[in-house]
Amino acid sequence: WPILDGVLVTAMTYNGTIPGPMIKVTEGDRVKVVFTNQLEEPTTIHWHGVEVPNAMDGVPGITQAPIQPGETFTYEFVAKPAGTFIYHSHYESDRQVSAGLYGPFIIEPRASQRPEPDVDVTLMLSEWLVRDGVTYPAMPMSGMEPNYFTINGKAYPATETLHVKVGQTVRLRLIGIGQFIHPMHLHGFPFKVMAIDGHPVPETAQQTMDTLSVAPGQRFDIEFTPTEPGQWMFHCHILHHTTNDNVDPGGLMMIIEVTP
């Protein structure tokens, strides 16, 4: 998988992409996911934060047997509650999730009490360790710290540029899927935290911020309205995380291009 021009990682994927395909449903929908394991090792899928029956929780050896290579398993549940969630491997998950087995699972509300934003984008934050062309699981331990950092599977300058207009309401769904905390900082405009871990924040409790720490497994929906045109940076403020193999700039950075 190319995280950057000239930098390939050895990855595991859902349907050939990192992150895996976005699954977007409406609250109350009956969800049926037919999963075939084409890896050379067992795996499962866990529906992180989603209220599912115990047998659908995807924990190997506890709620189901690991899905062996070549086997198919069907996950079925009713989508609830509304919010921003994740699907990811729960088999040797420190290694398989680090290798790319994750994706966004979005449950839209059946009847929203809030106006929908003009722009709605999901950003999954992760890390990689590549040494002498070999990919290792990036972990918070000596000798295993990451040297590449990605947004939706890409490191800056390969990260996607977000194009918006002055006056639009922009929602960013921030998802921490790696093993490190990332304080994400927006240049140019403050934002409000609208939801945490899929649960709406009451209007009276919404905080206005410009930097928000996203921990592993956490999800935040933030919203802002650009007031000035230009190219504005959104990046992790652990500044080593904005490098590619210790070369600045790179990593967890993306441009938000605002036009009049």
Placement of each model-derived feature along the sequence:
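Surface-exposed interaction/gating patches
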Residues: 122-132, 138-192, 219-224
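Extracellular/periplasmic metallocenter environments
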Residues: 39-42, 52, 58-116, 209-260
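Short loop/turn segments at secondary-structure transitions that flank enzyme active sites
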Residues: 51, 95, 111, 129-131, ...
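Divalent metal-coordination and catalytic microenvironments
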Residues: 33, 45, 89, 105, ...
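Intrinsic, low-complexity N-terminal interaction/targeting segments
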Residues: 147, 192-212, 233
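N-terminal, post-signal-peptide metal-ligating segments of extracellular/periplasmic oxidoreductases
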Residues: 1-74, 116-118, 140-171, 211, ...
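Active/binding-pocket-proximal capping segment
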Residues: 185-204, 239-241, 253-255
